[in-house]
């Protein structure tokens, strides 16, 4: 995939019409794959915050029929919301909305007491529905912390996932991402827990204190 020329050839020869790219890879190959993008029915980009300038450039020079921002953590089967960007991004846009929940998925933005926040107010994004995983393998404490009962669902034993992502509802019904409520960062779509790195460094005999920033 890192060889954009070869990847473009494979896409053309296969006749593929749907493509998913991580945000980092999309930014890297957007110009080289312009011809491929223009032939797609769906181009889905996700895994990190999208760069509005790259989105505008693709829509201006090589727009696919549908360019989607796909949002959702692995714990909810990767995609929980989508947003079609073709007619949404203008020259002044800096933030790319996450969009609305996909089918059989519920998204709640809750305050610190677990109550829904009003439109425009920041809260933590929680995701419920059929895509929520059972939990983490051999990590019952973390499972109990992140996968919690869904009080808004009528389904028996329904649970929702606490994402740690901050967001708010826009007046148009779309969700806007506002950052994290912890020290997790993403690099090229991969989760990095800064606290885990700090703990490893602090465990070294030669280290008295450690702070990791990104």
Where are these regions (language model features)?
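Adenylate-forming
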Residues: 1-97, 104-106, 111-116, 141
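AMP-dependent adenylate-forming
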Residues: 52, 60, 66-69, 84-214
């Amino acid at each position: 995939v890192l060889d954009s020329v070869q990847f473009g050839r494979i896409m053309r020869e296969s006749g593929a019409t749907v493509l998913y790219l991580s945000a980092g890879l999309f930014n890297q190959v957007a110009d080289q794959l312009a011809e491929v993008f223009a032939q797609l029915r769906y181009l889905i980009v996700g895994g990190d915050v999208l760069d509005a300038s790259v989105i505008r450039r693709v829509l201006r020079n090589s727009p696919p029929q549908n360019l989607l921002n796909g949002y959702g953590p692995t714990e909810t089967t990767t995609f929980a919301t989508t947003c079609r960007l073709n007619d949404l991004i203008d020259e002044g846009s800096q933030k790319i909305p996450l969009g609305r929940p996909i089918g059989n998925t519920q998204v709640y933005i809750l305050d610190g007491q677990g109550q829904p926040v009003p439109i425009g107010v920041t809260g933590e994004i929680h995701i419920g529905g059929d895509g929520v995983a059972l939990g983490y393998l051999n990590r019952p404490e973390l499972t109990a912390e992140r996968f919690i009962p869904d009080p808004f669902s009528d389904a028996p034993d329904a649970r929702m996932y606490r994402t740690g992502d901050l967001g708010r509802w826009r007046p148009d019904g779309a969700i806007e991402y506002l950052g994290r409520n912890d020290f997790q960062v993403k690099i090229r779509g991969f989760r990095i827990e800064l606290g885990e790195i700090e703990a490893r460094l602090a465990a070294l005999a030669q280290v008295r204190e450690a702070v990791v920033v990104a």
